[in-house]
Amino acid sequence: MVKLSLKIVFIFFLFSCSKSDDNKIELFVSGAQIAGVNGMHFGPDGLLYAASVIGSDISIIDTKTNKIIKRYDLSDGVVGPDDIAFNSKGEFYWTSILTGEVAGFNENGAKVIAGNPGPGVNPITFSDDDRLFVAQCFFDNGLFEMDPSGQTAPRIIKEEIGE
């Protein structure tokens, strides 16, 4: 596993090299209690939302002050978040790769469970018209459309998309 991780880091480094002198690396947060970030996304508020499966939390980071300003965790109903996405209202949703839950926080800050298509749910995105899509990897490999409010069951677009 370590060899694979090193190979991935090397490949990322190799392909991210550029001849431009304008590129620079800037450290946002140091010494933070973030246990490995799996997915991250800038929210409409300009803050960086970082999801951690291992830490089982979502950290909200102000990249101007380099501070973690909020953290959602188990006490907020966040369990093993992997990836994260925002809709046009600024609500954010995440996938939990281990439990299969797709959930988010609505405009009022209440947790909403969109559904549970099963373990391995990983990538998540909203279309321009706020339709929610997720897919699975590792355990299964289906592609689903989810009702963000959780009122209707996940719609299977394609099962076994990897075959």
What is each of the regions a protein language model found here?
Residues 15-16:
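C-terminal motif of bacterial Sec signal peptides marking the signal peptidase cleavage site
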Residues 24-31, 67-74, 109-115, 152-159:
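A short beta-strand motif characteristic of beta-propeller blades
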